[in-house]
Regions:
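Alpha-helical segment of the N-proximal tetratricopeptide repeat
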Residues: 9-36, 51
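Short helix-capping/linker turns of helical repeat alpha-solenoids
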Residues: 9-10, 21-22, 39-43, 55-57, ...
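Terminal, low-structured helical/coil segments at or just beyond the last alpha-helical repeat
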Residues: 11, 252-268
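Hydrophobic face of amphipathic alpha-helices that form TPR/SEL1-like repeat modules
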Residues: 14-21, 48-55, 84-91, 120-127, ...
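TPR/TPR-like (Sel1-like) alpha-helical repeat modules
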Residues: 70-73, 217, 240-259
């Protein structure tokens, strides 16, 4: 072929170009790439386009359109699209709230090895939402989620080991799972591991480590991490006593929705 014509980018390349455009805040160009990829039946393109309509950054927010695009993505075996549909049906955003459908989409996401989908499915079985409550199944899906590097799945499995629910109580295993959750940037996992270090359960008692983990949890926007760290600053445990810092962490906990922290602030 003469004329130096470049080959048309394939659907995967179109998605990559769209992501690059999105990162560069060129949302209009990103939308064009995603539309083209989705038109070529690329699930990732449809899912990414759905995200644009979901967050309303580059196009007018349209949850109905987002739901349609996520549905197409899911049908094209794009796990993230199925997981997004779980969220829409669970919260009733852009579609009528339907917990049974939410569970079905979480299950499909998990079948497609989407770790977040498996974690959500574990939560649904653990709470009996959209499916019959079954802690054995919850543990199974948390375990699969954790194997797929979903921090929430590791953390929730850790809780079952700490409590001895449907698995034999094992605090060392719980500590390991919280540690993995924390490494995967799950704030609650960091907080729960911090509490084990604070109490010396499953690990050797270490208040400095507890403070570090509560701090990490707080950075990851886990309100209970912020309030736990505030208590350490008040008591001078694992950190130097500092009431100003304690107040800052109580304030952050309140902003993140910790009602007890808000009550403490009101009393000041």
């Amino acid at each position: 072929m003469g004329g130096g014509l470049m080959a048309e980018p394939n659907p995967e390349e179109l998605v990559d170009l769209g992501v690059e455009s999105y990162k560069a805040k060129d949302y209009i160009q990103a939308k064009k790439y995603f539309e083209k990829a989705c038109g070529l039946n690329n699930g990732g393109g449809c899912g990414a386009l759905g995200d644009l309509y979901d967050d309303g950054k580059s196009v007018e927010k349209n949850l109905i359109k987002a739901a349609q695009l996520y549905t197409k993505a899911c049908e094209l075996k794009e796990g993230v699209g199925c997981k997004r549909l779980w969220s829409l049906y669970y919260y009733g955003r852009g579609v009528e709230k339907n917990l049974i459908k939410a569970a079905q989409y979480a299950s499909k996401a998990c079948d497609l090895n989407n770790g977040s989908g498996c974690g959500v499915l574990g939560f649904l079985y653990g709470s009996g939402k959209g499916v019959e409550k079954n802690l054995i199944k919850a543990a199974y899906f948390y375990s699969k989620a954790c194997d797929l590097n979903n921090g929430g799945g590791c953390g929730n499995l850790g809780v079952l080991y700490q409590k001895g629910e449907v698995v034999e109580k094992n605090l060392i295993k719980a500590a390991y799972l919280y540690s993995k959750a924390c490494e995967l940037k799950d704030g609650l996992g960091c907080k729960d591991l911090g509490t084990l270090y604070y109490n010396g359960k499953g690990v050797e008692k270490d208040l400095t480590k507890a403070a570090y983990l509560y701090s990490k949890a707080c950075e990851l926007k886990e309100r209970l991490g912020c309030s736990a760290l505030a208590v350490l600053y008040i008591n001078g445990q694992g950190v130097e006593k500092n009431l100003t810092k304690a107040d800052q962490y109580i304030s952050k906990a309140c902003k993140l929705g910790d009602q007890e922290a808000c009550e403490v602030l009101k009393e000041k």
